[in-house]
């Protein structure tokens, strides 16, 4: 006989281990509303204090996955692979990665999210493209994935609905940072997308949600262990987020940066290292490449041949965007009325930056949300960001502020200059790929 919800809560509060049936019953009540908001909050707090072992977290992930629709791609006969990032600043990797990997053979049905806190959201970036539909019908989504090889859309109401309710309650009960609940939340949505393989980008640094190396590794290990326990071939790369990844932060600006990357104009950058590392790992996971070096060679060929750009263009068009978007992006992406230079305040080397504050500055410009119902100004942001280690002279531009008006641009410009430290000596370089968790 199933335990009453309060008995499940009591068992977890007291440090007990819940079995699969107990977790499934609780999640069923979470999804259908028969368990009260107070009981859900108590369960979340009990989990925050007592934690979960791997088997419990696998059971919670699968139960939340099974609370709604599960996509089935078996009829396509191609590997189904995806990537998830825990969020950063100037992180537009998904925009390039999906068409690059699709050009190499696998299908990439990417279900993405909006901006969260100081980090940008893939959907917000894509919505800077006129007509782009992030909520196509399930039939159109499948058709585009079949024809193009990839499609980037938003979560539907019927994918992991139990997670939506649990997350909303976690958000107001100080339980967002529970590793088991983070793990189940991320993976339930990804597993509902019908993936066979998953590669995770777990960010570490002052522009990520986790700034502590040990906590970051704990989360990466939890995600990898639980996803593999749930039957999805998964690994994680911990990547550096102590400076913006792209040289632009902001929605339309990051789309323009994506197009420059797909034209081959960003080779050798930290962004390029991350895109190629994830493309290589995804192709190995999909068994399209024997090892990462072979996967990177395939990805580089897809980029240099123009195949990846063609797939991006077709994806945009099939999801409602202009057919000639990649050729005439300047005609379609709105431009900010005011652009001002952020000058270096002294001679020296860019030694460090407050990455989170750069993300918050873009939100202050209107490029992100402080409330869920806020409208985003897709035009605004930062561009021309110089990477750390660059030698600069006093007065030289280290960034450009794109804003809705001159007054706003100048106010943010004065803040941005203070977010950079300039030193006499060149700083030691940091690897962008910190570690690999399997």
Swiss-Prot record:
Gene Ontology MF term list: 1,4-alpha-oligoglucan phosphorylase activity; thymidine phosphorylase activity
GO biological process, one term: pyrimidine nucleobase metabolic process
Keywords associated with the record: Glycosyltransferase, Transferase
Enzyme Commission code: 2.4.2.4
CC annotations in GO: cytosol
Pathway annotation from the record: Pyrimidine metabolism; dTMP biosynthesis via salvage pathway; dTMP from thymine: step 1/2
Superkingdom per UniProt: Bacteria
Residues passing through the membrane, by range: none
Reactions this protein catalyses: thymidine + phosphate = 2-deoxy-alpha-D-ribose 1-phosphate + thymine
Role, per record: The enzymes which catalyze the reversible phosphorolysis of pyrimidine nucleosides are involved in the degradation of these compounds and in their utilization as carbon and energy sources, or in the rescue of pyrimidine bases for nucleotide synthesis.
Quaternary structure (record): Homodimer.
Protein name (database record): Thymidine phosphorylase
Organism whose genome encodes this protein: Sinorhizobium fredii (strain NBRC 101917 / NGR234)
